[in-house]
Amino acid sequence: MVFHHIPVLLHQVLEVLKPRPEGVYLDGTVGGGGHSAAILQKLSGRGRVIGLDQDPAALAAAGRKLASFGDRVTLVRSNFRHIGAVVAELGLTGKIDGILLDIGVSSHQLDEAERGFTYRMDAPLDMRMNPESALTASKLLNEAPEGEIARILRDYGEERWAKRIAQFIVKRRALQPLERTGELVDIIRAAIPAAARQEGGHPAKRTFQALRIAVNDELGALEEALPAALEALAPGGRLAVISFHSLEDRIVKSFFAEQARGCLCPPDFPVCACGNRPKVKIITKKPLVGSDEEMRANPRAQSAKLRAAEKIR
């Protein structure tokens, strides 16, 4: 099987990471290996890349793409939320020169119908990035309470019709369990009023995004990964994160802002008593986005935002 995945914001990633020839870099979401290959081409001597991915198909594809780099590549099957444990196992805590996290679903996962990520093809309601995980989209939709389904659609998909869609899902599953993406698309079309279905692209887009985030606990993984990644970096090391929707971007922006803060004392204190010092320097005051040319060539880049920070201590 050919693993098709175009690395987004590649030029910008290299620009903010500034790979040093003998540096050690970690790609927390190696995917097809596109970003890692570009980083490896900048390295020499003892320079190496550690690539993580929870999807075995992605890891196998990365292995094929990066095979020519030999032992300068270490591939590990793991969710990026476990960066701390992986780096500790390799004896590299506090020694990594740069970390990249490219969050979200890959082009390959979207194109592979049987994975159930896309609303454009009928397939099993799966949506797992790790095919060995217990929770599928079908299991969630057939077992979760109506209120929980509505919360997921509202919080993770920013879906204005979340409550109504959840009601329709629960009514439908009482007759027969939901098992196919096509069934879910039909339910969403029925739940959203005709006039509203014409707004903002495909009517199922937000629901599918929300379910994918919930099934894979993507926001929880990101919140765990960010502090672990910072700890894994050497002083002067850089953390770059590519996000694809506002929920992720807010988490990254907030984390960087928090770590960049200095004194936490009340403003009326004459001298600092807390001793807190900034842990990072923010490199991207505003998120970097793709060029018009990249967005035309790669639709996935249209919603991509890159933020980066450098570890001070």
From Swiss-Prot:
Q: Where is this region: Disordered?
A: 291-313
Q: Which UniProt keywords apply?
A: Cytoplasm, Methyltransferase, rRNA processing, S-adenosyl-L-methionine, Transferase
Top-rank EC class of the record's enzyme: transferase
The residues listed in the UniProt record as binding S-adenosyl-L-methionine, with positions renumbered to this chain, are: G33, G34, H35, D53, F80, D102, Q109
Where found, per UniProt?
Cytoplasm
Give an example GO biological process.
rRNA base methylation
Which SUPFAM superfamilies does the protein's record reference? Putative methyltransferase TM0872, insert domain, S-adenosyl-L-methionine-dependent methyltransferases
Matching entries from InterPro entries are given as: RsmH (IPR002903), SAM-dep_MeTrfase_MraW_recog (IPR023397), SAM-dependent_MTases_sf (IPR029063)
Q: Name one GO cellular component term.
A: cytoplasm
* Catalytic reaction equation(s): cytidine(1402) in 16S rRNA + S-adenosyl-L-methionine = N(4)-methylcytidine(1402) in 16S rRNA + S-adenosyl-L-homocysteine + H(+)
List, alphabetically, the Gene3D superfamilies matched.
Putative methyltransferase TM0872, insert domain (1.10.150.170), Vaccinia Virus protein VP39 (3.40.50.150)
Q: Name one GO molecular function term.
A: rRNA (cytosine-N4-)-methyltransferase activity
Pfam short name (any one): Methyltransf_5
What's the main place this protein lives? cytoplasm
The EC number(s) given in the record are: 2.1.1.199
Q: What does this protein do?
A: Specifically methylates the N4 position of cytidine in position 1402 (C1402) of 16S rRNA.
Similarity annotation: Belongs to the methyltransferase superfamily. RsmH family.
This protein is called Ribosomal RNA small subunit methyltransferase H
